[in-house]
Structure formats: C-alpha cells, structure tokens
C-alpha cells in the first residue's frame, strides 16, 4: 500500500520526465538540435534504464577486443560517485594517474584492468572527447568508447550499443522517478545493437529478442563469467593466496545496483553467505559504515567478500583497509561472455575503426 501511494505521488514527475525526454529526442531526430561529430570513431555503450544492466563488464569486453586487434582505445565516462569535477585524465595508457575517489569506482576498475587504454572522466562526454584530441594530438586513440552515453545525444556515434537486463527489460515501462526508465521505450530504435544481459529464462529472452527484431541490426546475448576470489588489503600487508570458495563463510557486502546477482554468483562458486549487508550504488565507504562490517566479520569468524568495483572504492579511501587486521578480505571478479552474437558484434566493432 505504501509503495502504491508513493508511485501515485511520483507519477506526475515521471510524466514530466518522460515528456521532456520525448521532446528532446524529437528535436535531435528532426535536426533542430545538432550532434557534434568527432573525427575519432565513437562507440557508445549505454542503456534505457538506470543501473544494474551489466554495462561496465561489456565496456571492459569491448576494450579488451580492441586491444586484442592492435587498436588503441580510449574511454570517456561520467565517473559516477567521483569527488572531482570537470574533465579528468584517469589513465594516459601508460600510467594510472587518479584513484577511485577522483575517477569513480567503475572507471578506476576499467583503467586498472586495461592499462594500455586512455581513460577520461567528464560530465559532458563531448568535452572529454575534445580533451583527448588535444592531449593526445600526436598519438590519438583509434576509437573512443562512451560509457553510459545512450542519452547523451550531443555527441554523434558510429555504433550505438544498448544493454538490456532481461530480468526486467524495461523496468515495467515506468519513467524515472516512478520507475527506472530514462526515456520512453521507443528510444531503443536509435540503437544498432541490443545486448541482453542477466538471462535466467531463455524463453523470456526469446520474447524480448522477437520484440526487438526489426528495431536493431543485432540482438546479442551475454552471460556472466564468474572468476576467482581475489584477496586484497592495505598496501604493504601481504595477502593470502586465492581462497578456496567452497565452504568459505562470508559476510557479503556491496554498494551496487543489483546485489542479488552478486549473491547468486557467490553461491554458484560455493561460498556460504552467512551475512549480507548492502548500500546504495556508488555509496562511499567511511569508518561509520565499514567498521561495523569488519567488527561483525571478526566476531563471527567470517571473510569479508565484495565486488571488484567495491574493492576499488575501498582502496581509494585512506586508512580504511588498515582496520581489517585479522579479517580476510576478497573480491569476486566477473566478466562478460557471449552466448550469441559475439562474432557479428566484433565485425561491427572492427568496421568502426576500418571505415
């Protein structure tokens, strides 16, 4: 009943949000608002809904693909959760220059996992691209990947990829703030590629694909590739080898949009999740919210287990990990794998830099 009343209160704001988004899209579609065309090829990876689609692992996959074929890619991201403003150079492709507090947790993770890529954060993606063109004038990247930029239409793109969470593909078709849609569902028609993520029901994925057929050139499907548990701790303290996940007793914690997927992945690895504690997506860790986790884990003999992006957020906060003396900490590494459409997507990505 409370949720229903809240939805009724939020509905006028959602209607206004949807109207503004629709008018804005119409102005771009009719050429009344112009998009700036970068001389460097641009690939955009985004979504229709707010949070929790598996977009960041796909950005990582695309980065690694371009590096594997000898290209020099760059990423421009907003840098959600960062404590900095304007355009910031996170990595120049040789050295990582900023930590997670000034770059954002996801951006810090992308830079660390792809050290040869240029990584920039900017509220306005076009400003980030222009910065790259000036800063790397003599050695410009071959391609720029826009992270979470489907709605950022001021910057033209050569390939538009939208990630769709197949568990809740269009978040019950309700606009923000009543639901999670950032724009009307019809916006999917601007995309070249739709990537279905978090598939648990193939028949539901089939139905989504059938609905999208004709609107996009390719509908691809992904799966979560569950990696190792990687131990971490304060700099200078030796960490234990990779723990055996089978039977590991854990206090699982994270500040992400879809914590249920994280817990499911831990359980698939054989981790015994004894306790769970979750925070808002990108919420900063402080002594006030992290120390209770450490104390509970120490008291109950549990290992602290979190996500890779939460690890980078923790490592960016001076002094926090020093409080974990006597308590094991590790993060679960995940990646994107494809069950359908990988080769076709690679062809499309290659065509962007070839043309």
From Swiss-Prot:
An MF annotation (GO) of this entry: ATP binding
Cellular component terms per the entry's GO annotation: plasma membrane
Keywords (A to Z) from UniProt: ATP-binding, Kinase, Lipid A biosynthesis, Lipid biosynthesis, Lipid metabolism, Nucleotide-binding, Transferase
Keyword Nucleotide-binding recorded: yes
Reaction it catalyzes: a lipid A disaccharide + ATP = a lipid IVA + ADP + H(+)
Keyword Lipid metabolism carried by entry: yes
Disulfide bonds: none
Highest taxon of source: Bacteria
InterPro entries assigned to the protein according to its UniProt record, in alphabetical order: LpxK, P-loop_NTPase
GO biological process: lipid A biosynthetic process; lipopolysaccharide core region biosynthetic process
SUPFAM superfamilies, alphabetized: P-loop containing nucleoside triphosphate hydrolases
UniProt: ATP binding residues: 49-56
EC code(s) of this entry: 2.7.1.130
Pathway(s) served: Glycolipid biosynthesis; lipid IV(A) biosynthesis; lipid IV(A) from (3R)-3-hydroxytetradecanoyl-[acyl-carrier-protein] and UDP-N-acetyl-alpha-D-glucosamine: step 6/6
Family: Belongs to the LpxK family.
The protein's role, per its UniProt record: Transfers the gamma-phosphate of ATP to the 4'-position of a tetraacyldisaccharide 1-phosphate intermediate (termed DS-1-P) to form tetraacyldisaccharide 1,4'-bis-phosphate (lipid IVA).
Name of the molecule in the record: Tetraacyldisaccharide 4'-kinase
Gene name linked to the record: lpxK
């Amino acid at each position: 009943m409370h949720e229903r009343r809240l939805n009724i209160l939020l509905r006028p704001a959602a209607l206004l949000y949807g109207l503004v988004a629709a008018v804005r899209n119409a102005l771009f579609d009719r050429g009344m608002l112009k998009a700036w065309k970068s001389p460097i090829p641009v690939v955009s990876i985004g979504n229709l809904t707010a949070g929790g689609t598996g977009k960041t692992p796909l950005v990582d996959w695309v980065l690694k693909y371009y590096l594997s074929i000898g290209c020099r890619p760059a990423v421009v991201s907003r840098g959600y959760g960062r404590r900095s403003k304007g355009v910031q150079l996170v990595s120049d492709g040789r050295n990582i220059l900023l930590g997670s507090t000034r770059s954002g947790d996801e951006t810090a993770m992308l830079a660390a996992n792809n050290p040869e890529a240029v990584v920039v954060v900017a509220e306005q993606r076009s400003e980030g691209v222009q910065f790259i063109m000036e800063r790397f004038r003599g050695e410009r990247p071959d391609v720029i990947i826009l992270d979470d930029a489907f709605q950022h239409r001021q910057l033209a793109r050569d390939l538009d990829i939208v990630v769709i969470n197949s568990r809740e593909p269009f978040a019950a078709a309700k606009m923000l703030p009543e639901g999670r849609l950032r724009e009307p569902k019809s916006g999917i028609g601007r995309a070249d590629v739709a990537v279905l993520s978090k598939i648990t029901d193939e028949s539901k994925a089939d139905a989504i694909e059938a609905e999208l057929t004709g609107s996009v050139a390719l509908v691809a499907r992904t799966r979560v590739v569950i990696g190792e548990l990687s131990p971490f701790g304060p700099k200078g303290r030796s960490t234990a080898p990779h723990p055996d996940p089978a039977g590991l007793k854990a206090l699982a914690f994270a500040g992400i949009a879809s914590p249920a997927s994280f817990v499911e992945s831990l359980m698939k690895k054989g981790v015994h999740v004894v306790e769970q504690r979750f925070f808002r997506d990108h919420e900063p860790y402080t002594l006030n919210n992290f120390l209770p986790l450490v104390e509970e884990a120490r008291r109950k003999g549990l290992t602290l287990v979190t996500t890779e992006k939460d690890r980078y957020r923790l490592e960016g906060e001076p002094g926090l990990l020093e409080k974990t003396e006597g308590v094991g900490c590790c993060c679960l590494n995940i990646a994107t794998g494809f069950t359908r459409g990988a080769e076709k997507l690679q062809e499309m990505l290659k065509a962007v830099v070839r043309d």
